[in-house]
Amino acid sequence: MTAIDRRLLLAAASGLTFLGPSSLWAADKPKEIRIDWATYNPVSMLLKEKGYLEKEFAKDAIAIRWVQTNSSSNALQFLNAGSIDFGSTAGSAALVARINGNPIKSIYVYSRPEWTALVTTKDSKINKVEDLKGKKVAMVRGTDPHIFLVRALFSAGLTDKDITPVLVQQHADGGNLLIRGDVDAWAGLDPMMAQHEIKDGARLFYRNPAANTWGILNAREEFAKDHADIIPRVLAAYEEARRYSLAHYDELKQIFI
């Protein structure tokens, strides 16, 4: 299984919804629905490619506006600022954001991926988590890779105080720092992680699929409250895309690449 294949697979157990009781009354319909697409969420890329949402809401004259997000923290920032109505994140990032007051509602599980690991260069002497002691490690704060790193350190009897964290804004920045030699390791995320494996020989020295959290679709709480009738329709389109992805893996892979 290739670097891309092993982390593109979508869990059959995904597609869970978290909708609770909602009001039967909704505010006036919105003029547009703003939703993210992300390379860490292949289902969103296929959803955008197939136009399922556009077809669903054409009869209501509701436009669909796609906004690219580059990380869970990016999507959560957009949701918190009201720049998008739906954003995809890792489950752990959504939980932390909600605890910290971000008004979001997690409504759907779109995948159970293995999208994060700890990465180093091909010639590095780092081979296990314990080797990170005293090393510089790049990460995006508050994302699944960051939480994955913290858990890995804990499992090895270390904490974040035993390393030198190098915080970056985007996951791609962390990968670039690693390849340039500015850091010793990187809490990576696909597809950037797979790209560096293929192009630069980067090594995934620590993997733990069970420590990767689910891919979650979140809605702005205000939007979910005001437009409760729209939420199930968005989820139906998402589920159609997810099921299509499972049945047409080669096509999903081409869209992803």
List where the protein language model places each region.
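N-terminal secretory signal peptides and thylakoid transit peptides that target proteins
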Residues: 1-16
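A generic structural signal for well-ordered alpha-helical segments enriched in polar/charged residues
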Residues: 15, 55, 155, 236, ...
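Sec/Tat signal peptide C-region and signal peptidase I cleavage site
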Residues: 22-26
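Short, glycine-/small- and polar/acidic-enriched structural segments
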Residues: 27-160, 165-174, 180, 184-190, ...
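Pocket-lining segment of extracytoplasmic ligand-binding domains
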Residues: 92, 165-166, 171-257
